[in-house]
């Protein structure tokens, strides 16, 4: 838009621009100064960044129209990790992996202690597990539904996880958080025998006779993200 002569304004809820590139991706995968350099180029092109402003809460789209803004492009991404809908999923020490990454990148969380279990075999699961290692976790175990060779993260990320000392447990689905005094003390799993049905759709099947329990004080789940609209579109 700036290159075509417009003067776009980016409203950012966080204290700095960059979105998931700055707050969701670990520095060992994408250095923050690279993103900051790209943002500086955008500023030179005439893009204005207004940080610490949550549209829908601090200012509405209707109010922005009154201020003279004529067009709106919503690019909030899939920034919510949702909830872990199993018994004990709201215990202390259990949180979405993407929220954990945000805390680390914004320097709200610098260290971890005790044993950590990461749920999810995708790229975010790999990022979260490797970040947990760097935050000082005693041990990190990663569990996923898929078979070892079918993990969505791929061979490269899986190998990087194992080089970092992460133990991969493929073919397991979580059933319950073990809670002691309101805090996470472990996670129970059952064997996953199949992830997709004959039509290729997600329809996991399990063998309830095969189970195991992982001890941990922190459980980080990375099982999909969704849009968190909040009050963004109120009045539109």
How would you name each of these model-derived features?
Residues 1-10, 124-133:
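N-terminal Rossmann-like FAD-binding beta1-loop-alpha1 element of flavoenzymes
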Residues 3-22, 140-149:
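Glycine-rich FAD pyrophosphate-binding loop
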Residues 16, 122-124:
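Residue-level detector of alpha-helix initiation sites
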Residues 24-29:
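Short glycine-enriched, charge-decorated loop/helix-capping segments at active-site entrances
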Residues 33-83, 95-105, 109-112, 134-235:
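A Rossmann-like FAD-binding core segment of flavoenzymes
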Residues 83-89:
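Short loop/helix-cap segments at secondary-structure boundaries that form the rim of catalytic
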Residues 111-122:
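Beta1/beta-strand and adjacent pyrophosphate-binding region of the FAD-binding site
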């Amino acid at each position: 838009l700036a290159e075509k002569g417009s003067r776009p304004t980016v409203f950012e809820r966080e204290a700095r621009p960059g979105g998931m590139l700055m707050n969701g991706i670990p520095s060992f995968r994408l250095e923050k100064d690279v993103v900051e350099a790209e943002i500086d180029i955008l500023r030179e092109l005439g893009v204005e960044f207004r940080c610490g402003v949550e549209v829908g809460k601090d200012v509405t789209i209707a109010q922005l129209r009154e201020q003279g803004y004529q067009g709106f492009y919503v690019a909030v991404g899939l920034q919510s990790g949702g909830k872990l809908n199993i018994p004990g999923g709201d215990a202390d020490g259990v949180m979405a992996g993407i929220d954990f990454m945000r805390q680390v990148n914004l320097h709200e969380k610098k260290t971890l202690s005790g044993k950590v279990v990461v749920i999810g075999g995708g790229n975010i699961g790999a990022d979260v597990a490797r970040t947990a290692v760097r935050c000082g976790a005693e041990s990190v175990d990663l569990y996923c539904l898929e078979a070892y060779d079918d993990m969505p993260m791929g061979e490269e990320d899986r190998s990087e996880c194992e080089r970092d000392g992460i133990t991969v447990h493929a073919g397991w689905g979580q059933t319950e958080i073990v809670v002691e005094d309101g805090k996470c003390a472990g996670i129970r799993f059952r064997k996953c025998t199949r992830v997709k049905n004959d039509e290729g759709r997600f329809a996991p099947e399990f063998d309830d006779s095969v189970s195991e329990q992982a001890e941990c004080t922190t459980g980080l789940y990375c099982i999909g993200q969704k849009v968190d609209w909040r009050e963004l579109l109120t009045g539109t």
